[in-house]
Amino acid sequence: MEQKPSKVECGSDPEENSARSPDGKRKRKNGQCSLKTSMSGYIPSYLDKDEQCVVCGDKATGYHYRCITCEGCKGFFRRTIQKNLHPTYSCKYDSCCVIDKITRNQCQLCRFKKCIAVGMAMDLVLDDSKRVAKRKLIEQNRERRRKEEMIRSLQQRPEPTPEEWDLIHIATEAHRSTNAQGSHWKQRRKFLPDDIGQSPIVSMPDGDKVDLEAFSEFTKIITPAITRVVDFAKKLPMFSELPCEDQIILLKGCCMEIMSLRAAVRYDPESDTLTLSGEMAVKREQLKNGGLGVVSDAIFELGKSLSAFNLDDTEVALLQAVLLMSTDRSGLLCVDKIEKSQEAYLLAFEHYVNHRKHNIPHFWPKLLMKEREVQSSILYKGAAAEGRPGGSLGVHPEGQQLLGMHVVQGPQVRQLEQQLGEAGSLQGPVLQHQSPKSPQQRLLELLHRSGILHARAVCGEDDSSEADSPSSSEEEPEVCEDLAGNAASP
């Protein structure tokens, strides 16, 4: 029987068999995959082992258009409906072909009829636009399930143990009792007048410039701020149990970081100011020109980024404890003990973050990155900009004294005094001289008058002090005595 021109010859699937190689031989396409290939794909768990396609008997791969079929019959049925090919199909044997995995490609009409007979639904075959919409819906459902799974995992994360709660309460109380103005800092702060700190006019020995009026204002709050950091540390049992030498090293290492953190968490985006020591609100240029230099940029940027975290007092307290108990400080004696203490605070910190259930994704690792940022940006940003050693703040010596990273280095003060007056004297002839004072003289006088020099008792003289200095042998007991008792007062 002749086939009509409009009909497709039996056994010539236009999708599966139309491709030919240059020599005229047929090439196998994806729809005509071998038995080995069809059996190696993903098989859903709801199928029984070796379950067969209801159309051709090949290995089934899942429910397709309401029937359990193989990939080949699924694709054949979809193409037939999408391209409306079934009216063109015909059979040479009066629609009596037996369809199995060997003969399925020999007669499209009988294969399609069997698809319909076993229950494959034509209305479930989607056109391109509907298929795209379905894919989008599937992705949305997957994303929703991922979020639900994330919420469940967050709810299942461990919260603080009773021992950790004790550690948390002690750190929180230590912070609150040493944090000036507490939660009322916005109501009690005073803005530094705009005309102060806007024009650095006094040149320092290293070439930097500073606004003396702003510097003078900052020196009024630096010693109480240092004292509060020392008091905070002394209220932590793990710190108090350390040798005096390690306490000094840890305080010298973290003083700048903790004061910077306390200022950063009091960043006000509306006025673009930081509140220092809980009482003085300053702008970026005022802080920079008052002695901090480029480090002020690091503190302001830290304040901006931390504002999105909405940290409470406990999180700030634990962050301070982690900064304090850092084994990165050189010269420590009890490194293992300090490391275990920091790990205890870190674990309690992580569990407390789980307890608060923040809405920020990956809150804990992001917060840990901020902890490292407090250290690295404050310690090294200035050094990179100024070309100074990484261990310093990267600002002029007076700026280091102002923020207390090394808490008034004895040699730095003596060097300035030697340039201007009697060596080693705290009240040399320069300070009593009645002639007009140079900028350096005025700066040194401010240092003495402000009481910053008394902060030496908090963290001791620098290790580089001259060995033959008359006072060097007497200062270490003074430091240990201060740490064991009250912090140094202004």
Swiss-Prot record:
Main location: nucleus
Zinc finger (NR C4-type) in chain: 53-73, 91-115
Keyword Ribonucleoprotein carried by entry: no
Positions contributing to Zn(2+) 2 binding: 91, 97, 107, 110
GO process annotations (BP): cartilage condensation; cell differentiation; erythrocyte differentiation; female courtship behavior; hormone-mediated signaling pathway; learning or memory; mRNA transcription by RNA polymerase II; negative regulation of DNA-templated transcription
SUPFAM superfamilies found in the cross-reference section: Glucocorticoid receptor-like (DNA-binding domain), Nuclear receptor ligand-binding domain
Region (Modulating): 1-52
Binding annotation for Zn(2+) 1: 53, 56, 70, 73
Location(s), subcellular: Nucleus
Domain NR LBD: residue ranges: 163-407
Effect on the protein upon substituting residue 277 to N: No effect on thyroid hormone binding
Keyword Metal-binding recorded: yes
Highest taxon listed in the record's lineage: Eukaryota
Residue range(s) of DNA binding per entry: 53-127
Any one Gene Ontology cellular component term annotated for this protein: nucleus
InterPro entries: NHR-like_dom_sf, Nucl_hrmn_rcpt_lig-bd, Nuclear_hormone_rcpt_NR1, Nuclear_hrmn_rcpt, ThyrH_rcpt, Znf_hrmn_rcpt, Znf_NHR/GATA
Gene3D superfamilies: Erythroid Transcription Factor GATA-1, subunit A (3.30.50.10), Retinoid X Receptor (1.10.565.10)
Family statement: Belongs to the nuclear hormone receptor family. NR1 subfamily.
Domain commentary: Composed of three domains: a modulating N-terminal domain, a DNA-binding domain and a C-terminal ligand-binding domain.
Subunit structure: Binds DNA as a dimer; homodimer and heterodimer with RXRB. Interacts with NCOA3 and NCOA6 coactivators, leading to a strong increase of transcription of target genes. Probably interacts with SFPQ. Interacts with C1D. Interacts with AKAP13. Interacts with TP53INP2. Interacts with PER2. Isoform alpha-2 and isoform alpha-1 interact with TACC1, but the interaction with alpha-1 is weaker. The interaction with isoform alpha-1, but not alpha-2, is decreased in the presence of thyroid hormone T3.
Name under which the protein is recorded: Thyroid hormone receptor alpha
Organism: Homo sapiens
High-level lineage: Eukaryota, Metazoa, Chordata, Craniata, Vertebrata
Name of the coding gene: THRA
